């Protein structure tokens, strides 16, 4: 993309409970470029919503669940965090998404450089796993 796009975080509030189709109409009225799918508590989207997002001619991004911590001490939390990122990327990719966003982790009273290196390593591992599972069309930054 070679322009700055303006998106809403989720469906505009004015759409009420009318879903993505109504949301996209409001985005058109507001002259906005798209929206971020908000997978705040889990990567879930109904078939009807998938169809509406897939048919949209708007820029789509996605926000992974908040329960991500690539600096977790517990292996099960690390695995679940990686899985949440991969699921978000896969769904975003399926729906024509441009990119995903996630909060990578917490300091847990550790040294900043250690935390940075832990998270960087896990992001590389996650990206490699995702590339093996399904080559993504998502924009990928340098790690």
Predicted segment positions?
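Active-site acidic/histidine proton-transfer and metal-coordination neighborhood
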Residues: 71-143
